[in-house]
Structures are given as structure tokens and as C-alpha cells.
Amino acid sequence: MNSVQLKDVGLDLAELIADISRKTFQETFGPVNTEADMQLFLQKQFTTDKLIKEVGIPGNRHVLAYVDGIPAGYLFLKYHAHALLLNDPALEISRIYCLEKFQGKGVGKSLMLEAIMDANRKQLKWVWLGVWKENAKAISFYRSFGFNTFGTTDFLLGNDWQEDWLMARKC
């Protein structure tokens, strides 16, 4: 039986968060981007030092998902508004990552429901996120939770500028 458990994490697990970040990003985007762009991005964005700083910022929340006791993915939440959402109180899902071998086991669903419940507990008006417009699997997943596109933003992967969609749902 696959049982998903969620646990808030702090600085002590920043290295594990960095490892999961690098692995899931490579699994998801490596096949459709150049090796040079991927390496440049991974070396800048998912260092242990950077993740330690990120985890230590008040108001950020990292939630680790375990399947049968094994780390399977994580959620990174930021509590701030977006101008295109009228600057209403909001929660940004900055990352929702699941290792490939655990996809289809309820990890993503558990993490998404935790984000939505957190926003509701805090009486926020929106949950929003950015997603690469070419990531059809993720877009379909987000739509299944009621997310709709409300704008676009540029995203630099290595030396390659890409367009991300901004998606949101009301709480």
C-alpha cells in the first residue's frame, strides 16, 4: 500500500530538498532542453546554500512528501499577492515537485490539497503558480484543481528565455 505522509521541513533537510529539486527538474525538463542550459540552471538555482537561505526566510513553507517512509517530492509555498490578482492576499505554489518513480501514487494530489487547505486556513483569496506553457501534464493537473490561466511571465532556463503561464484559483 502506498501511503503519503507530509511533513513541514526546516534547515536540517535543505540538502534533501536540493537533491529532490535537482532530480525532479532534470527528470521533467532535461529531455526537452539542452544539457548546457539544464546544467547552468541547476548549478545556480538548486544549490544547498541557496535552498538553506530559501528555507530560512520567514513566511516560506516547505513540505516534504514521503511514500511509505521514502522522500518522494515536496511543496514550496510563499505567502504574497500578485499584481494581476488585484494584490489580494494569496499563496504562491513556487514549487510542487514529485520524483518520477512516485508519480501516480497520490503525492502531487496530497501536496496540492495541502497548499489549498493552507490558503483556506489563512483565509487567503487566491492560490497561484507559474508553469512552463509546454508542460501539458502539469497544466492538466493544475486545471483538475480548478486553476485557470491569468497571465504569462518570462523564465530563464540557463541561457534560454521561455514563457510560463501564470495560473490561479480562488479559495
Where are these regions (language model features)?
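Active-site acidic-Proline motif in GNAT/NAT acetyltransferases
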Residues: 99-101, 105, 133-134
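Conserved phosphate-binding and hydrolysis motifs of nucleotide-dependent enzymes
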Residues: 69, 73, 106-108, 146
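K/E-rich alpha-helical interaction surfaces of small helical-bundle regulatory domains
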Residues: 24-28, 140, 148
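Conserved acetyl-CoA-binding loop-helix of GNAT-fold acetyltransferases
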Residues: 104-117, 140-144
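C-terminal "cap" of GNAT-fold acetyltransferases
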Residues: 3, 91, 125-139, 144-145, ...
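Acetyl-CoA-dependent GNAT
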Residues: 8-14, 18-31, 39-101, 112-114, ...
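Short acidic-aromatic loop segments in the C-terminal HATPase_c
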Residues: 97, 147-148
